[in-house]
Amino acid sequence: MVSNHENELNQGSAAEAPAPNTAQEWPEDGKETVDACPLCGGVERSVVHPTLTDRIFFCAPGVWSLYRCKTCHCGYLDPRPTPQTIGLAYAEYYTHAAPQDEVFLSSATFVGRRLAVLRNGYLNARFPNLGLQPAHPLGSRLMGLFPATRALAERDVRHLPTPEPGARLLDIGCGSGAFVSRALSLGYAAEGLEFDAKAVLAALGGGLPVRHGALPDTGLDSDSYDVITLSQVIEHLHEPMAALQEIFRLLKPGGVFWLATPNMDAPGHVQFGPDWRGLEPPRHLVLVSPQALALALERSGFAQIEFKSPGAVSEWFHRASYRIANNAKPGADIALPKHLAKLARREDRDSLNKPVVGEELVVMARKPR
């Protein structure tokens, strides 16, 4: 969800955003209390943001509180919408749109266009059947000069290796299927699973192999997939631990799990506080810290847990957060102040060597053989 992170509403003008839907309350019988941390079960906690509202899509009513677990340091809403009513928060969600190929790097500037050509050449060398154009034939060599851009290119193909013949990939929470389409072009026997019926219809309309279903009860066969990816999904789940255990069950022995999610400990969260784009209440029910995510994966049975650099994503998060802080419309073309742009660039550089300091956490793990 990072490059072309989402097709946010009303793009273009920097006019004032609509007011959050606080006049209408979330149905009281549609809330549930959270007595313990959804990841580690800890009960000691502290309040981080007591009065959050939906300032992304402006469709979810209510005011929400985010707490931080004192044991694993993840964040979670309490109370939160019930599984039966959470759909109220997705009335205007971006996955309802028809699937489109992901835009990996901006081509709006001269530099962006040149980097996109290098990136295409780099990925074509990684995946011989990909055929991205325009592409520079020396992209695989020259991309070493642009490590943050190379890291973003790797993130956008989810750090996947060239597939063995017949390798099966499942993208869970695939939306309208953009990455399913990309994985097919990479050479995987790819399919998607999506809980949003409107998004499934959009994917099927695009001819993509996407079925309706959700974690943790997928109904799929055990030991079935070589790769499972979960991009910007775990933060939406009521039962994140059960979801990780289900993914472990679905993977073949030796199979790879790839996950991306906002980082509760991100510098942008420190900088912007309740305006940080990664919060997105009440759709984001849980926000993991590096410590919480590693512990949850270990407890679910995974091994070879490795955090990856998210690449040059910080400016996107900072710009989106700055829009929220300034009450601008979602997607508005608003300039990021120089000091914030500098902070974002430094964060991207730092995340190349220490991946857990980025706006996103990106991690790969394996099911032991």
For every predicted segment, state its role:
Residues 2-8, 12, 20-39, 47, ...:
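A C-terminal cap/extension of S-adenosyl-L-methionine-dependent methyltransferases
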Residues 12-117:
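N-terminal juxtadomain amphipathic helix
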Residues 80, 98-101, 265, 272, ...:
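Short amphipathic alpha-helical interaction/hinge segments
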